[in-house]
Every structure is written in C-alpha cells, then in structure tokens.
Amino acid sequence: MILIADSGSTKTEWLLVGKQGIERTFRTSGINPYFLGEEEIRRVLTREVLVELPIERITDVYFYGAGCIGLPGEMLCLQLHRVIGPDTVEVNSVLIGAARALFGDKAGIVAILGTGSNSGFYDGRDIILQTPSLGFILGDEGSGSDLGKHLLSDAMK
C-alpha cells in the first residue's frame, strides 16, 4: 500500500492507495517540520496517523508539505521511516506534489495560491525554475486571510 500526504502547518490530508485504487482518505494535524520538532512530529504520526492505517503493510510514503526543504525535510523523512516503517519515503515540497498531481511525468507550469503561494516550471521530474515564496506574511495571495481582507476592504468602502 502507498500512503500520500499533502501537508501545511494547520492540517494534513492523507490518501491511502492499494491495488484497487484509493482505499481511503483521512485528515490529521498539520506537519510542518520547519516549525515542529522530532517529538511533536512523532506524536502526530503515532497518535493520529498510525490509528488510521490498515493492518496491511505500507510500502511507500510520499509526503508533500510546507517546510520540507533541507534539514527539516530530512528529519521528517527519518520520523516517517521510524514510525510507519515503509521501504520508501519521499519528502518534497507542496509545489512538487502539485506538479506531479497535475502533470505526472510531463512538463508544465504549476502554481499554488494561498499561504506561501508560489509557482515554478516542472520538467517532468523536478521544479527547475521557481518563483520564491514570500511566506504567509507577504505571499498569501488567495489564502483565507487575503480573501477576507479584500472582502472587508471592499465592503467598508
């Protein structure tokens, strides 16, 4: 079985894929390794993720999330290996996750709106050209906060 995660700081959406296709989906607390330490991540994985998994062994985990570049992503990868125990763990950015979902192994331009919005060119394997995200303070175009700000601003004019 394959476990796929799409995570931000607030929530993580999980998808369990078996031989017949999608088996189930579930949601847990967000896992952003830039802000969470090893113990906090291990706690979410053991208390919220493991209880949702079937008895059948998970062979592969693909985790796409905020804060997953560099050392924080490596630490998350280690925790996923330790807690879930799959053969393969891959931890990548949400932009790679969106690109793979949209294009598979074909090239294309991918963009994410919301907290930490960004965009890039995907060559079918990697993001090779990327607009850097300005984070949730300056780069939240399309997020709930941004849309609410525009709505209130327009209503008060």
Language-model features: locations:
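Active-site phosphate-binding/coordination module
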Residues: 78-81, 121-122, 127
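Short glycine-aspartate micro-motif
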Residues: 2-6, 60-62, 90, 108-112
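Active-site glycine-centered loops adjacent to acidic/histidine catalytic or metal-binding residues
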Residues: 94, 114
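Short beta-strand-loop/turn "lid" adjacent to the catalytic site in phosphate-handling enzymes
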Residues: 49-91, 102-103
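Short beta-strand scaffold segments in enzyme catalytic cores
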Residues: 12-17, 100, 111, 117-122
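Glycine-rich phosphate-binding loop plus the immediately following alpha-helix
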Residues: 127-157
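Short glycine-rich, Thr/Ser-proximal phosphate-binding strand/loop in the N-terminal lobe
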Residues: 2-43, 56-57, 127-128, 133-134
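Helical "lid/coupling" subdomains associated with nucleotide-phosphate turnover
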Residues: 96-97, 102
